[in-house]
């Protein structure tokens, strides 16, 4: 030991090497014995040691410990001989003295002496004792753990310190790789010498025992120890039970330990415990977790990281803090504060985390590989499967991922995403100790590695063969599961960061060719022969197979295409070949014809009725555009396949123009790709044929078109022309309007009936979806309904006005054109339409239908019983199947809600007086009520104006026909708005008007007792087909009238 420097504070207990030991003085031992005799019940030396399985863990008996302690342990009063900074103090034992742990120097071998000589002594505060502390922190076993746990009072620990056994550590630098590490581990910082490098990079592996030995010492023993012991005490009992197996394997190799009574040793051991604790406590802390991942960092990055560390992370500053602790231990006031703070740490774990977070994080970054390996083997003894998974993971990653556990911020989130699923199934029940991502490293014994880096330290400690075999035996299942877990994360993060350690891990597990030559695409649809399948995952391209998961109807199929039967492929992107506006890209695969039977077998023989040429072609509609990187990788895969199969043409993709002749002759019935995809996008010639039967009309063609945009194919058969029109590959289908002369298709009713209505080919255009029906179609179908659909009895009782009637009634005219300016407004309106009823008396009818168009919206007004002046109840006719009778019996007890309009909510006094009497007889009677029904599919019209105009018209018409005056008011001619089926768009109002009339004729309303419910008058699907039904009716009548005229 260096004792020549004056003023330098001597260590509290010097380590004597090579058998030189200073025996404690007899006076001091006498004082210790006196203290122990004062409270003998507090000291039970044999009690904690009797619980240990010494025969299983220790080769040295308890007597050997005593003998070794007497021969080689220094006196405990050594520190009292020289105080802080050279000031002498009395040798009296202070009750505030901390527990000092002594470590035996393990550098007794030739290599250890050489190692001591190579360490420069450029720091006055670092001595040989510090080197020994840093070089030989022990791998603690359960025996030493339980011994240290029971050291509670200070005088007990002083007396028991003589009985603590020495543990000799095997030097892990005895291998060739260790000597190489010594040469390459120097750091150029001024305040970090080789001693600090050894201290930071070669801390010996701390197991659960070393953790618990630190946490169970009293908090007032050491400031650093109190911080780490507050949180780790929760895992003592659980770790004790499961660390037996691992410790036995280490002890078989002759690894042992010994505790010293030096404060700085405890601080170093406490720091190691902090390493372990942070990994277990901060499970959700991404910064701490990221530092526990195995990564490869360059020397420059490691230097930059160390230069950014605060002063508290410097070993020199740690030594200074240890000095301050030694100064404070002689000051009772300071000691009291430290003890209180230590107790607070035990009481408030959150406060402990806040205080120690920074220093613990930095210490984790300096854990060496061999310490990480020991941690991976012993940090999770509570669960065998968790430990096995971590050991196999480290053996799988091997040496390429061993290094200082530091990550740049860019990689942290990605690695957390990858690592957590691997450990999630093992993390239950290990909330206090096992973190989500413990440090995982690899040793040289667990597997040979071919790639080695000079920047990475790979120590090879002497381990039991059983550990290696255990790692190898348990590595196989985890290795097989690793690519499945990490494949997706690697693929998504490969473009985000320049370095991904998990990608290198997979490269160690999967052959390089198989890993590189695999590509996944997200697709939306697959077209194989006659079927179209929806995507159920990603299509996978490899050199051996192509996997296509898809679903047809309710059947899920995973098609595996053997690449040995692949003939050609194609990749058609929208920007290169503008054949498609629907998808970004199409992948085309052409398989050999002798492979169709295998495809049909995989499709369970339920898809194809027979084999066809179209089955050879597989089209994959990709979800998004393909990147240049993916395109190059796909070409590499195809090149490899072509080399294997001996088909050189396979390495060259087919363009759209080259592939088109292969399937252009297929019909839409044979190929689903042509039917579903190309019919709306590319539409090749002769592939997507849509036949249109038209009348043979010779018309001059326009020959001065600059550039044709479509292809026209003509065929004449049986006096009709069959036309096939397809757009060019770079064009879309566009709606073609008729541009020829207007042609009258039908006259309904046909001659010789008078009042026939003509329908032309222009009128058919309004029957397209989304178009408003014009007045010609409205009038035609209303005439058709009353002449063809209504019963004779109902025809006699009904009258339908033309769609122009209400328009003429409400038309505004110039006052100069009026013959008699003294006429009222109602009389003027009636005069405009007086000739509409010259051959009919509407007051002899029960139902008068008036189509109304306001602001391009169609609705229906039905004038019911205009000849009645009040409500009349009659018996139901026996011959009429009553829709309203059944409805009335169901709704007779309901109250009047929205059916009676607000303007006519009050009925006459006679009605009110009769209602209570007639409620009982309503099921046996039918009600005839004079009213105006408004059947509106939107309720968007000005109903009040319409109803008032119709009342005024009826009043004038009554005077003209009956030659008497009658008032049509809100009381005797009420307006009702029953609930009817409503439209779900903005263009079907005319269709609903026609359906209201048709439903009325089919199932008329004969009972007008309120309320009137017509919500289920007809189903909605009737409206969906009504336009097409009217079109077919017109064309059918057109053919009938054509045949009649020709004959």
UniProtKB/Swiss-Prot annotation:
Q: What's the superkingdom here? A: Eukaryota
- Keyword Magnesium in the entry? The reply is no
Q: Where does the record place the modification Phosphoserine?
A: 11-12, 25, 432, 442-443
Q: Where is the active site?
A: 857, 936, 989 (nucleophile)
Q: Which SUPFAM superfamilies match?
A: Cysteine proteinases (SSF54001)
As for what it does, the entry says: Protease that acts as a positive regulator of the cGAS-STING pathway by catalyzing desumoylation of CGAS. Desumoylation of CGAS promotes DNA-binding activity of CGAS, subsequent oligomerization and activation. Deconjugates SUMO2 and SUMO3 from targeted proteins, but not SUMO1. Catalyzes the deconjugation of poly-SUMO2 and poly-SUMO3 chains. Has very low efficiency in processing full-length SUMO proteins to their mature forms.
Can you say what this protein is called?
A: Sentrin-specific protease 7
Gene that produces this protein: SENP7
């Amino acid at each position: 030991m260096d004792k020549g420097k004056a003023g330098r504070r001597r260590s509290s207990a010097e380590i004597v090497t090579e058998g030189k030991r200073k025996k404690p003085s007899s006076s001091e031992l006498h004082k210790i014995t006196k203290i122990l005799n004062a409270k003998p019940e507090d000291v039970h030396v044999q009690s904690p040691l009797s619980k240990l399985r010494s025969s299983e863990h220790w080769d040295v008996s308890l007597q050997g410990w005593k003998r070794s302690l007497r021969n080689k342990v220094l006196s405990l009063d050594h520190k009292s001989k020289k105080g802080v900074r050279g000031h002498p103090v009395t040798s009296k034992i202070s009750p505030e003295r901390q527990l000092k742990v002594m470590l035996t120097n393990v550098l007794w071998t030739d290599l250890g002496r050489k190692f001591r000589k190579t360490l420069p002594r450029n720091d006055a505060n670092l001595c040989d004792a510090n080197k020994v502390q840093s070089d030989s922190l022990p791998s603690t076993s359960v025996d030493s753990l339980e011994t240290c746990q029971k050291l509670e009072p200070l005088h007990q620990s002083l007396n028991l310190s003589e009985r603590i056994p020495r543990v000799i550590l095997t030097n892990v630098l005895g291998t060739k790789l260790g000597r190489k590490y010594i040469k390459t581990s120097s750091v150029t910082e001024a305040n970090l010498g080789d001693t600090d490098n050894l201290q930071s990079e070669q801390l010996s592996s701390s197991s659960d025992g070393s953790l618990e030995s630190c946490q169970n010492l009293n908090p007032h023993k050491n400031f650093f120890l109190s911080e780490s012991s507050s949180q780790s005490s929760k895992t003592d009992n659980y770790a004790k039970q499961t660390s037996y197996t691992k410790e036995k394997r280490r002890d078989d190799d002759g690894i042992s330990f010994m505790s010293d009574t030096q404060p700085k040793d405890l601080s170093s051991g406490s720091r190691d415990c902090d390493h372990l604790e942070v990994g277990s406590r901060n499970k959700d802390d991404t910064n701490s977790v990221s530092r526990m991942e195995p990564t490869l960092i360059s020397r420059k990055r490691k230097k930059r990281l160390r230069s950014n560390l605060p002063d508290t992370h410097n070993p020199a500053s740690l030594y200074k803090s240890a000095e301050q602790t030694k100064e404070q231990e002689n000051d009772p006031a300071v000691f009291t504060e430290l003890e209180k703070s230590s107790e607070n740490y035990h009481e408030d774990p959150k406060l402990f985390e806040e205080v120690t977070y920074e220093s613990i994080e930095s210490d984790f970054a300096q854990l060496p590989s061999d310490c990480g390996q020991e941690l991976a083997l012993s940090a999770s003894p509570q669960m065998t499967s968790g430990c096995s998974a971590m050991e196999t993971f480290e053996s799988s990653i091997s040496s390429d991922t061993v290094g200082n556990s530091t990550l740049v911020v860019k990689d942290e989130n990605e690695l957390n995403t990858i690592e957590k699923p691997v450990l999630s199934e093992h993390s239950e029940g290990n909330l206090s100790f096992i973190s989500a991502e413990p440090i995982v490293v690899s040793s040289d014994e667990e597997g040979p590695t071919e790639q080695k880096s000079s920047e990475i330290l790979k120590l090879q400690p002497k381990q039991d063969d059983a550990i290696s075999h255990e790692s190898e035996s348990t590595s196989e299942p985890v290795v097989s599961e690793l690519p499945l877990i990490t494949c997706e994360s690697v693929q998504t993060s490969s473009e985000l960061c320049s370095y991904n350690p998990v990608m290198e891990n997979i490269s160690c597990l999967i052959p390089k060719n198989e890993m590189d030559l695999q590509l996944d695409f997200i697709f939306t649809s697959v077209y194989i022969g006659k079927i179209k399948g929806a995507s159920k995952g990603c299509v996978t391209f490899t050199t051996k197979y192509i996997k296509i998961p898809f679903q047809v109807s309710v059947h899920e199929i995973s098609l595996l295409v053997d690449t040995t039967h692949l003939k050609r492929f194609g990749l058609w992107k929208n920007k290169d070949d503008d054949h498609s506006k629907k998808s970004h890209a199409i992948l085309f695969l052409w398989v050999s014809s002798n492979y169709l039977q295998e495809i049909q077998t995989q499709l369970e023989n339920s898809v194809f009725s027979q084999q066809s040429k179209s089955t050879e072609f597989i089209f994959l509609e990709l979800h998004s555009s393909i990147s240049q990187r993916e395109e190059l990788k796909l070409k590499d895969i195809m090149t490899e396949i072509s080399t294997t199969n001996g088909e050189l043409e396979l390495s060259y993709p087919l363009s759209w123009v080259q592939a088109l002749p292969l399937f252009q002759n297929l019909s839409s019935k044979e190929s689903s790709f042509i039917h579903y995809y190309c019919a709306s996008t590319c539409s090749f010639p002769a592939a997507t044929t849509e036949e249109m039967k038209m009348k043979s009309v010779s018309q001059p063609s326009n020959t001065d078109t600059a550039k044709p945009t479509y292809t026209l194919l003509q065929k004449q058969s049986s006096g009709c022309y069959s036309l096939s029109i397809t757009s060019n590959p770079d064009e879309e289908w566009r709606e073609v309007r008729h541009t020829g002369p207007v042609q009258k298709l039908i006259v309904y009713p046909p001659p010789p009936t008078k009042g026939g209505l003509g329908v032309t080919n222009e009128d058919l255009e309004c029957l397209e979806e989304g178009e408003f029906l014009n007045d010609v179609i409205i009038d035609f179908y209303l005439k058709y309904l009353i002449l063809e659909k209504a019963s004779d009895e109902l025809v006699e009782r009904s009258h339908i006005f033309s769609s122009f009637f209400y328009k003429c009634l409400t038309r505004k005219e110039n006052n100069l054109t009026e013959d008699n300016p003294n006429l009222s407004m109602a009389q003027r309106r009636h005069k405009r339409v007086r000739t509409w009823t010259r051959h009919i008396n509407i007051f002899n009818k029960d139902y008068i239908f008036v189509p109304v168009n306001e602001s391009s919206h169609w609705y229906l007004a039905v004038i019911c019983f205009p000849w009645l002046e009040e409500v009349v109840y009659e018996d139901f006719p026996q011959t009429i199947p009553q829709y309203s009778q059944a409805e009335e019996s169901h709704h007779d007890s309901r109250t009047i809600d929205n059916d009676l309009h607000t303007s006519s909510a009050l009925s006459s006094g006679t009605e009110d007086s009769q209602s209570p009497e007639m409620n009982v007889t309503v099921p046996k009677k039918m009600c005839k009520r004079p009213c105006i029904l408004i059947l509106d599919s939107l309720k968007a019209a000005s109903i009040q104006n319409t109803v008032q105009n119709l009342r005024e018209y009826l009043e004038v018409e009554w005077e003209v026909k009956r030659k008497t005056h009658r008032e049509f008011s809100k009381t005797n001619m009420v307006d009702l708005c029953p609930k009817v089926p409503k439209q779900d768009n903005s263009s079907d109002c005319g269709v609903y008007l026609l359906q209201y009339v048709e439903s009325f004729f089919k199932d008329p309303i004969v009972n007008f007792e309120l309320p009137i419910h017509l919500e289920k008058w007809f189903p909605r699907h009737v409206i969906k087909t009504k336009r097409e039904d009217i079109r077919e009716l017109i064309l059918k009548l057109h053919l009938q009238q054509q045949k009649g005229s020709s004959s």
